[in-house]
Structure formats: C-alpha cells, structure tokens
C-alpha cells in the first residue's frame, strides 16, 4: 500500500513541475524556464550606465540562474548598429530618439560567449550565445496572458524551438511560379545613362586611381539599411523602444552571421541601420501610408516597398505582423552580378509596367499560421532573404545540400542557410552559408559593393542619439531645433556639446524643457497605460523615470485581463478567485463558447464554463467576455477570428480538410447508426428509387430508336422541332410505247 502512495505523490510532484518547466509557450517553443530577477535593480543600473562617466560604470551587470547554469552578463551600450546618419521617423516627424537601451556584451569568464539585447523597464530581452548553444529571453506576457506568474520573463534554448516551414510551400520563399515572375520582371529594367555601366567610368580613371580605389574598397564592407515597420508590427510590440529593440536584434543576428563568413577574400561584411520609419497605429488610416490596408498579399506587399525610391540605401526592408498565405515569412529580390536588376545597391529605374521601382528590397513577417514565431526563426528568415539580395539563389546539388546526403556523417551536419526548405535550426550548418552561396555572393559583392557600401566605423555626432563622448545630439543644422545643444555642423570640440549655461537638452530625454532646464517634479513625461501610471519627471534628470504600477487586479485589455505587477498579464477570472480554463469542443461545449473567456473553480476542471453562463452570472453580471481576435482557442488547436469563431489551424490546406471530412471514420459510423435506427425510411427510399427508375425507363422507351423492325418507330419527344424539306418538282415518268407496238416495230426491223 505504501509503494502506490509514493508513486502517486511522485507523479503529482512531477505534474506540478510541468506547469513551469515542461509546458510549451506556443506551438514553436517546446520548453522554457521563468526569470524573476529584480527589475527595479536592473533599471537603476541601466540609468546609471546611461549617465556613466567612469569606465566601470558604463557596464551593465546582470546575474541570474536558469537551465541548470549561472549567467553572469557583462554588457555595454551598443552603438555599432546605427550609422552616422541614423534617423527615426514616425507620422512624418523626425524623432530625437535615444538608443541607449540597446546593449551588447558577453558572459563573464566564458570565452567566445556573446549577448545582445535591450533593457526596457528593467527587463532584458535578447539572445545569449554560449558554448552550449544560444538562449533567448523574452517578456513572459508575450506568450502567457492568462494567469499570475512568479516570473516576468521567459528563457528558452534554440534546441527547444520547433521550426515552421518558414519559407512557404515546398520550403521556398514563395512557390516557383512567383520566383519565375520576379526573375522575368527583373530582366525588363531600363538603365539610365552612365548608371548602366559604372565599371567603364572606373576603368577610364587609369591604373593608379584604380589601385587606390581597390585599396579603399578593402574597407568598404558595410551595407546600410532602411527599415520600415507597419502599424501591425507596432501594434504587436506596443512601443517605439520595443520596435527599435526588435530591429536591433534582427540586424545584430545577421551581422554576426555575415561578419564571420569569408566571401572569397571579402571579409567582415557588416550592417548598419541608416534610417527607421515606424508606422504607428495612428498611421493605419493615413492615405499616404502604402501599408495601411489589412489584407495585402506577400507579392503586393513587396511591390509596395519597391515602389518607393531607395537609392540612398544598400537594402530597404519592411517588417510586419501579417499572416501571409501558405505560411510565407519572407520575400526578396534576388541579386545578380549582371544581366538583371535587383539585390544590393540597386537603384530606382523604369520597368516594363511603366513604373519606377527599387528592387533592393525585401519583407519580413513575424506571424505564421496564426501564431507568432520565435525571434530565432525570424532572424534566420532575415538572413535568408538578405542572402537572396546578396545574389544567392536556393542551395542545390550534393555539394551544397549535405542534409540530403546518404552519408550519415554529412547528413548529421544539416543544410545551410539558403537551403530551399525548412531546417531544424540546431545543426552545425544551419547558421552558415554553403560554398554555392559563397561563390554567388562573392561575385555580386565584387561587382556591386562599390556602388553603395560604406566604411565601417562608430556612429558620430548628428544621428540624434546621445552616445559616448556626447553631451547631447540634436542632429545637423537643418534638423536641430533646440537652443541648448551645438549641432553636428559645428567644429570639433564644440559639436554635440551643451551650450554654455545650459542644464540639459531635449535630445537627452523628455524631462528637459525647450529652455534647457530640467522639468519640475510634477510634470508628466509619459502617458498612463492600462497597468502603469503616468510617468513624472524627478526634477534632476532629462530621462523619464519608470512609471509606478497600478493596483493588482485592475481591469485591462478591454476587461479581458487584469494587471499583475504593472503588466497586463493575468486573467479576468483571477479577479474573482477563479482560474481561467479552455472551453474545448472535446468537453462538449457549444462551438460558440470556444472564443469566450471561460473560468473554473480552482482545482475543479468540471466547473469550467463561459463567463456568460448562469454559473458565473453573479461574478460577471451575465456579461459574456470574449477572447481577442487572434487568441488561441479549443485547447490551442485554433485561433479566434474577428467574428468570434474558432478557426482550426490546418497547415495542409482545404484539400486536406475535405479529405478528412470525406474519409472520417466518424462520418461512416454516424451513417451506419442512422440506418439502423431508421431502417423503415431506408426501405421506403429504396422502393421509391426502384419505382422512379422503372417509370423513367417506361416513359423514355417509346422515344428510343430500336433496330428491331417488328417494333413501331419511336415517337418524337414533345416540343421537338421538325425540319421542313423544300418542295421538290414532280417529274413525269418517260412515256413508253405499248408492248405490241414495240414488238411489231422490232419485228419489222
């Protein structure tokens, strides 16, 4: 009796652990752990690092334990991702934006480690590369929104990511027909003047100048990016800081891959963000916003990006949160050394449809079949699409697709970045370029990088960000609007410094007035949100302090959730000491309830019912609370649409659903049960069918021709038109002589 009891206790204990250490975050992440370090302490360290003067204070330290090991992060502000002309625009305005929340670092004492991310409201979000693989850290409420959590962030390993078919049907960025249409279109570009053959102008400069140009080219290894985000991307991440952090994370991820690749002698290829355009939710109805429409196909979305002039950039991308057809996560124009347009450094030109377009473009989405993909997936997608821009088609052949090899040793290493179909992401080759890709990319780099690549270097005064060695940064003379800071056109030693007698500059933060003084303690610097109070200046810094949280269990997210520690992360059920549950169809619930918020008593799954049911009428006053469109439903087997119907997620498409409907065993069981219960109806239907067929044969037989000559001819069908024949002239038969006359005459002869 003791042994079964012990086993039951062990199973219960294991099940309790599963809630935190075994449950997936979504269909792409199998395993995670929670992080609960002190966010207030990290926020204070972040503020101190921003104001740091001494070398030691410039570092941000973060220690925590997860996945059976200790992480001792030592990070410093990262300014290498933004060019000297960096701008952030939104709603037709240039913002004085500070990127001091972007950090790069390493694990203290672990050689070869690397970390990159952002610190927003005292929480680190990003990735950490270790000897044992890469870990990813994200806010917990991005995945878990239905209960109180003992942690604020989640951390998971790259091996625990289930990769979707991230490049669409048959594993491609789009199907073959789309690629073929794009290739043919790229051939129709019309070159303009000297731009058509820049190599001729280089050749005419003489051997001495050409040698100098090659020397200069050795350092021109940086591709400058223009990245736009549409209103849906902003809506998902919520703030400009979070959007900038996502862009920084993607650029840093591909920068790491390309910098460590030797493209036939061309090394240290890097990326810098030159300009960012953020379309906020207020731009959704702006007629000048080309991405304002909700239903845009992936090809049209790329075309809208290409219709803008991107001559000032190496590449121009748009990030969105759209669920494109066939699960496509990215699309880009493929570059070529010559013969067709498209790819890096491509200039705007006229094409066969009479439109001017820039084909140095691509698009990325973070949504796939109704779910948001992990950062690792979109990072690889970004690297793959940029690989197309750099001139690499999909890998093919035994040399460059080792994952298809019959040799187990080669197969174990997996396929490369430009492989046409989805990879597991955890193989040795998954984050590398194949020899085929390197050869193709090297040819394009040799031919085109002279046209737009720049020398790499640290960002300088004039980009609107207060960086190391700067007191302020209001931009260049045509951008600087405050009287507190010397603009970037001033002489060295003076530019990006506070003017004499000035306390601060608005470029340092929102708590500095236009009169160059700190705002008083009572002035607001941040609007309140569902779960956080408005930000109030402290009177001694230009930065806006962190907002105080609103009381726990305050309604948020349209009364579907409650606030927990300043985050809209709890279920509305918790407000009434209940637990949220799923109204799944397997529980015999009405299909209409699948998109309702459902609650149950703690530890009593049998009490699970909709908030609009009689069972919970006292708590919710008969009010039915519905899930937000896009929320998972039916035990994560589908998602709610805008009509509050649970749509099952089926990656196989409508044909597979039709096949399941026709060949479902349940269908035939139901038919058999009905026949047994209503045998008399089946008998009547059989007799009626026989009589119908007999009558049909009897009626139609009199009109059917027969080869039997003894049967009467067929009757014409009623309403049949008869063809009239024209009257024929009556011919007289020839006269014949009487037989006697004939014989007599014959006899006379």
Swiss-Prot record:
Catalytically inactive when the propeptide is intact and associated with the mature enzyme. The disintegrin and cysteine-rich regions modulate access of substrates to exerts an inhibitory effect on the cleavage of ADAM10 substrates. Residues 1-19 form the signal peptide. It catalyses: Endopeptidase of broad specificity. InterPro entries: ADAM10_ADAM17, ADAM10_Cys-rich, ADAM_Metalloproteinase, Disintegrin_dom, Disintegrin_dom_sf, MetalloPept_cat_dom_sf, Peptidase_M12B. Expressed in the brain, specifically in neurons and astrocytes (at protein level). Expressed in inner and outer pillar cells of the organ of Corti (at protein level). Expressed in kidney and lung. Glycans are attached at residues 268, 279, 440, 552. SMART domains: DISIN. Zn(2+) binds at residues 173, 384, 388, 394. Keywords: Cell junction, Cell membrane, Cell projection, Cleavage on pair of basic residues, Cytoplasm, Cytoplasmic vesicle, Disulfide bond, Glycoprotein, Golgi apparatus, Hydrolase, Membrane, Metal-binding, Metalloprotease, Notch signaling pathway, Phosphoprotein, Protease, SH3-binding, Signal, Transmembrane, Transmembrane helix, Zinc, Zymogen. Disruption phenotype: Conditional knockout in endothelial cells results in abnormal myocardial compaction, insufficient systolic contraction, and enlarged hearts relative to body weight. Conditional knockout in endothelial cells also results in dilated glomerular vessels and maturation defects in glomerular endothelial cells but kidney function is not impacted. It is an enzyme of class 3 (hydrolase). Its cofactor is Zn(2+). Binds 1 zinc ion per subunit. Residues 705-749 are annotated as: Disordered. Residues 221-457 form the Peptidase M12B domain. The Cys-rich region C-terminal to the disintegrin domain functions as a substrate-recognition module, it recognizes the EFNA5-EPHA3 Complex but not the individual proteins. Both Cys-rich and stalk region are necessary for interaction with TSPAN5, TSPAN10, TSPAN14, TSPAN17, TSPAN33. Stalk region is sufficient for interaction with TSPAN15. The propeptide keeps the metalloprotease in a latent form via a cysteine switch mechanism. This mechanism may be mediated by a highly conserved cysteine (Cys-173) in the propeptide, which interacts and neutralizes the zinc-coordinating HEXGHXXGXXHD catalytic core of the metalloprotease domain. The dissociation of the cysteine from the zinc ion upon the activation-peptide release activates the enzyme. This is Disintegrin and metalloproteinase domain-containing protein 10. It comes from Mus musculus.
């Amino acid at each position: 009796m003791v042994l079964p009891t012990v086993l039951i206790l062990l199973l219960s204990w294991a099940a309790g652990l599963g809630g935190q250490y075994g449950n997936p975050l979504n269909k792409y992440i199998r395993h995670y752990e929670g992080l609960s370090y002190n966010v207030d302490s990290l926020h204070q360290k972040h503020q101190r690092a921003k104001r740091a003067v001494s070398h030691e204070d410039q570092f941000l330290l973060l220690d925590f334990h997860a996945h059976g090991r200790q992480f001792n992060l030592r990070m410093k502000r990262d300014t290498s991702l933004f060019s000297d002309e960096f701008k952030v625009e939104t709603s037709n305005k240039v913002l004085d934006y500070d990127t001091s929340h972007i950090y790069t670092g390493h694990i203290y004492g672990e050689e070869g480690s690397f970390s990159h991310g952002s610190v927003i409201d005292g929480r680190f979000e990003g990735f950490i590369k270790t000897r044992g693989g890469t870990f990813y850290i994200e806010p917990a409420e991005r995945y878990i929104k239905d209960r109180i959590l003992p942690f604020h962030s989640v951390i998971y390993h790259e091996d625990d990511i289930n990769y979707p078919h991230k490049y669409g049907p048959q594993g491609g960025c789009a199907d073959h027909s789309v690629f073929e249409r794009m290739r043919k279109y790229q051939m129709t570009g019309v070159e303009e003047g000297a731009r058509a053959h820049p190599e001729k102008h280089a050749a005419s400069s003489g051997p001495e100048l050409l040698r100098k140009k090659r020397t200069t080219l050795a350092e021109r290894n940086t591709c400058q990016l223009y990245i736009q985000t549409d209103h849906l991307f902003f809506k998902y991440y919520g703030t400009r800081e979070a959007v900038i952090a996502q862009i920084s994370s993607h650029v840093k991820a591909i920068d790491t891959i390309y910098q460590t690749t030797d493209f036939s002698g061309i090394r240290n290829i890097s990326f810098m963000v030159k300009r960012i355009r953020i379309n906020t939710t207020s731009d959704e109805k702006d007629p000048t916003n080309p991405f304002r429409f909700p239903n845009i196909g992936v090809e049209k979305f790329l075309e809208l990006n290409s219709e803008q002039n991107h001559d000032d950039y190496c590449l121009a991308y748009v990030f969105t949160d759209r669920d494109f057809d066939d699960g496509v996560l990215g699309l880009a124009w493929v570059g070529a050394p010559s013969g067709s347009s498209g790819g890096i450094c491509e200039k705007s030109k006229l094409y066969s449809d009479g439109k001017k377009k820039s084909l140095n473009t691509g698009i990325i989405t973070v949504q796939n079949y109704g779910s948001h993909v992990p950062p690792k997936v979109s990072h690889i997608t970004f690297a793959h699409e940029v690989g197309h821009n750099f001139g690499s088609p999909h890998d093919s052949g035994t040399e460059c697709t080792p994952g298809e090899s019959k040799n187990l040793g080669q197969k174990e290493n997996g396929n490369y970045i430009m492989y046409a179909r989805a990879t597991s992401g955890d193989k040795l080759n998954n984050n590398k370029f194949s020899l085929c890709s390197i050869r193709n990319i090297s040819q394009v780099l040799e031919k085109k990088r002279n046209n737009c690549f720049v020398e790499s270097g640290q960002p300088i005064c004039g980009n609107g960000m207060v960086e190391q060695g700067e007191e302020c940064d209001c931009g260049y003379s045509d951008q600087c609007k405050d009287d507190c800071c010397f603009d970037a056109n001033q002489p060295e030693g003076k530019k990006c410094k506070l003017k004499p007698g000035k306390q601060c500059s608005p470029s340092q933060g929102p708590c500095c007035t236009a009169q160059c003084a700190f705002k008083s303690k009572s002035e607001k610097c941040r609007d309140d949100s569902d779960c956080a109070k408005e930000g109030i200046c402290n009177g001694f810094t230009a930065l806006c302090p962190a907002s105080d949280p609103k009381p726990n269990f305050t309604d948020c997210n349209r009364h579907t959730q409650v606030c927990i520690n300043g985050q809209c992360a709890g279920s509305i059920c918790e407000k009434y000491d209940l637990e949220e549950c799923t109204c799944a169809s397997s529980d015999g619930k009405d299909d209409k309830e699948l998109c309702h918020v459902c609650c149950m008593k703690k530890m009593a799954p049998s009490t699970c019912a909709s908030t609009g049911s009689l069972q919970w009428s006292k708590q919710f006053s008969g009010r039915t609370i519905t899930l937000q469109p896009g929320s998972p439903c039916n035990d994560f087997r589908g998602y709610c649409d805008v009509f509050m119907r649970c749509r099952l997620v089926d990656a196989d498409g409508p044909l597979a659903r039709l096949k399941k409907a026709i060949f479902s065993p349940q269908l035939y069981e139901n038919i058999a049960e009905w026949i047994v219960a209503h045998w008399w109806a089946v008998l009547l239907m059989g007799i009626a069918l026989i009589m119908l067929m007999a009558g049909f044969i009897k009626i139609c037989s009199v009109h059917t021709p027969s080869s039997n000559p003894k049967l009467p001819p067929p009757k014409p069908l009623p309403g049949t038109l008869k063809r009239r024949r024209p009257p024929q002239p009556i011919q007289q038969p020839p006269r014949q002589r009487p037989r006697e006359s004939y014989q007599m005459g014959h006899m006379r002869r």
